[in-house]
């Protein structure tokens, strides 16, 4: 079938190969001199006959007298249509840059968050300016100013932030670092806090089914964090942070060039909190004491003349946490009933490599190879519960990019391999498993830039536990009129549920753990399978002479099979495969507007309908608000000529509707909760004073409304009793927190 497809595409070029036209497509350099534009699309209007300009901008194209209109296009330039009357006369044509094809921006000058009008996938690009609107000490804190991601604490003990997208928790989101899956398996619970915010250059958030190139596991979407590149980062960067809760952080970047083609970067992170806090006076720490050391060494090789670029990254992490009752002493009270306490010690090592080659003579052909290995070891206990996990992971992906006929028709194809070894110790039981998979993928993209994009992909995988399966995904973008983009997508995802690693908050309870099932291949359970469908509409506008845009998103996730995490019996947590329906519906509308120069406003409303058929009946997913309102305002003063100093002001407001509590009706009356939580409203703000390109200071506050959950731990007065549970967290625990910091860099 594929061979027939190639023949059909190439046949018109063969038929009309008797006559040809030739020419050169150009752009202007910095001196306004003409230079050849490589990779430009040149094709006959309303045909499949076309080509791409070579490295010098030249082209040759089949001609027939019935062909009159020649279309020339390139991303970032105005598409031109020429009338060809004399095929014997070489064509020399300049393409002009245009603002009409740029990404839509939500700030007037330098966009901090952007959506593209041109891409088939619904991708939100977040750059470093957006990340600097909040302290963003680590990746889990980098979404406070983005309405597409929900952030809340997983429990009242560990201080772990949990993210959600489209109403689903992070295990259903593929979280990658430079397009290599990184937050998965053993790192699912705490991994977002293992990536310091200053290391992140930009974040790409993809809603709905992602690309088949990145694997088969994503269901709700993908989050990719691009790290700083040694060749572009400052030679020296220092970020110092301190907060009123006595949290201290230091980040240092050291970058240097080694010859003309090698660059190296050393990134150091240290953070600590060694003070006990109990604002709600329940005798439990509101946040854990911890120490973290994080070291990253990156090597970059760039040879643009020959088309080579490669990265090698080595990372080591040591993270220790202690939490529990105020009088808990791990030296004397560990795993006893003297006092309830917990320690979580994590050591992680990662090495990854990326190799890319672009043929200098054929720039539309490229080869990329990604490899990564990680070793993750966590030793922990929660009161009398023990949980240890060792996870070794290997990942490899090879990607070949090319075109068919002309650059409107692009293909990606390749092979991937993954290996995971898990060894988990839960109280007295040992759980082990090996997972390995090999897969092949093919993705076709059609792009005529201004009107229509289509990306269709399929991958076939063989997995030793999940079997053989196919993963199809499709994305379409259509622009019916100016400054508009209508998108639709669907795709399938399949994954193994890591029931313990992904739900570590269960250990900070007195619940009995039950796995109901024995016929599945993953601890007796079957894999999770879901389909995601989505539609999105983006429209730009001008109001009172100022730019803005409005977006409407609707996504639906239907589970064919799911590992249900059932909290409805307050003395148990039950894991079993779905019998019935489980779905997540998400609607979001977002408005970005620039009312006046240097001031940007973003507002969003989000509605969730997330329900599952539990053994006790269909219920809404616990602790998932149906309604959320979000607003962010940012302003920066104008840069005056000859001066580098300016002020920046940012404020973010979040309102969460009521959230359903899992049932506590079987508890004694004194340990019962209402059916729903109160609503929550929080305000974060930050002021930054930029003195120069080298130095700036910032001052901010989180939860300035001082909202706090007074009794987040059920049964805190009897932590070893049958009703102890720290998972009923619907909002902030600590109350207001203020911080200050500085940034210093030498370019």
Which role does the model predict for each range below?
Residues 26-33, 38-45, 73-77, 87-132, ...:
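Short, acidic, small-residue-rich periplasmic hinge/interaction motif at the N-terminus
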Residues 59-62, 180-207, 295:
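Short acidic/polar hinge/loop motifs at secondary-structure boundaries
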Residues 88-94, 139-142, 161-164, 190-196, ...:
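N-terminal periplasmic accessory domains that precede
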Residues 140-181:
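Extracytoplasmic beta-strand/coil segments of soluble accessory domains associated
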Residues 273-294, 300-367, 373-391:
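Flexible loop and strand-edge segments within Gram-negative outer membrane beta-barrel domains
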Residues 366-380, 479, 487, 523-577, ...:
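Membrane-embedded beta-barrel scaffold of Gram-negative outer-membrane proteins
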Residues 494, 655-664, 688-747:
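C-terminal beta-signal and adjacent terminal beta-strands/loops
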Residues 554-558, 577-662:
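Gram-negative outer-membrane beta-barrel transporters
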